[in-house]
Amino acid sequence: MKQRIAYIILILCFPFNVWGTDTPNSKQAREMFDKTYQMVFGEQGCSLHYDVNLIGLYKTSGNIWYKGEKSKFIEKRYWAWNDGKTHHMVDTKKKTVTLHHAKSDDKDKYSSNFKFEPENYNYNVESTNEGYLITLKLKHGCKGMKLIKALIDKKTRAPISLKIKVAFFWANINISNFKSGNIDNSTFVFPMNQYKTYTFIDKR
């Protein structure tokens, strides 16, 4: 989970405190969240820097690129490319490259803990000095992350930070250098020539 915690990055104005799926506040919150979510995971692509603090367990930072179903991330030890068909995970310490099908949950045994279905949450938004704070609370009987607090910029709607509760721990993610759009598809192509001396582990 430690090396793949970046994937939980973003799967993600009116100061009322009303929960539900049909209040003016919840509708506004959902619309705002959907816009930010599209800026991150839409076909135009995005790039950002992240700093993750998995409270009491782990800290890491890196850069990540998204474009539709494609992704790439770079940390100190782990690098990964997902071109929509094949997922390559590079361990620079062990000098290995592990291959999985892009959509396979097997590439990350913890991925089920971070499944995100927008319809499984109630939405709430409030205005703060730092930005708009959108809170997503898991509906009763649904599975997924229990609570998500997404802070977004009031003008651009770009993500600023995420606070995610899974089971009994919190993950805090600060986001910087966010850019939406102009992401070339070549970004997600695994540079095979750079890793000829590595051991390849094919789990497809």
Identify the function of each model-found stretch.
Residues 61-63, 77-79, 122-124, 147-151:
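Short, surface-exposed charged micro-motifs
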Residues 42, 64-72, 81-86, 128-129, ...:
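Short, solvent-exposed coil/turn segments at beta-strand boundaries
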Residues 21-26, 128-130, 140-147, 155-204:
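Non-transmembrane domains of secretory- and envelope-associated proteins
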Residues 49-53, 71-76, 133-141, 161-165:
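Short beta-strand segments that buttress and anchor functional surface loops
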Residues 89-144:
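Surface-exposed, polar helix/loop patches in the mature regions of secreted/periplasmic/lumenal proteins
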Residues 12, 16-58, 65, 69, ...:
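N-terminal leader/targeting segments and the immediate start of mature chains
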Residues 63-108, 166, 171:
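An acidic-aromatic
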Residues 2-10:
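Sec-dependent signal peptide recognition
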